[in-house]
Amino acid sequence: MNKKVGFYGGKFLPLHNGHIYSILYSARKCDELHVFLFYNTFEEKKKIEESVFPKKLLTPQTRELALKAEFKNYSNIKIHSIDSEKCFNNTNDNENIRWDSESKEVIKIVGCEPNIVFSSELEYEEFFKKSYPSAEIVVIDAKRKLFDISATEIRKNGEMKCWEHLSKAYKVLAAKSIVLFGEAALKRKIVTDLTKLYQTTCVEMYNANAEKLKNELLKARYNSNKIFFINADENNIKDFEEFYKEQDLCIFFENEKYFEILKNIKCKKISFENTFEECIKNINKLLL
């Protein structure tokens, strides 16, 4: 019996559950599935420039990491990436020639011509027939009946509106971080209540060090629900100033004692009157 070697390719801009379904479906139909990420395509730059979805999460490195994270426990799924720009050297803008260049690189990496090719797009069927003449072509859920989502829609609407469609790897990366500054005794209850309200996680900065913080952040992101909180320690703000500057939202419960120490960190200042409600209003803006 001949070994079934499969091919599934895409840009994964970004990886979503429609892609995941297609890859899992494909892997069940063959002995060995080679998933290819194509990046630096002619149209990719424009798509990223116009994206509402965070551009920093659409780099080739991030897309490849997301694919590898999702399928690391599947022994018959192999992840590869191809720099399409390098394939197109000495070619012109003719789409047939570009596809031919990419398919030659695919065959080189796989070690043979795939005998079964999977796609989620009907429009690519003719290209695949020319590029892999000996292969069976299988089109998966082309009308999006099982997963009514596309990477185009996610880029257009952003990560929060399309959260349920993102892969787990992308949810971990796209979760928004919210830092809460203020005196410990005064904000403890607020931090607890906000974490409960948004059904998410919180990182405590008290007695933090670089290694501990790295592990706690990863854990918080992995278990978060769109957002997660960082409870700042008023005693080590200066030590972690650069870290705080990188977060998505900083909220400062006004206290004259901290005005000077927080002057370099962009914060939303909230008085202790109606603090809980004001926090919610600012947090909800991140979720739009």
Model-derived segments and spans:
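Nucleotidyltransferase catalytic core that binds NTPs
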Residues: 1-199, 207-212, 222-226, 231-248, ...
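A charged, solvent-exposed segment within the mature domains of Sec-exported extracytoplasmic proteins
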Residues: 216-220
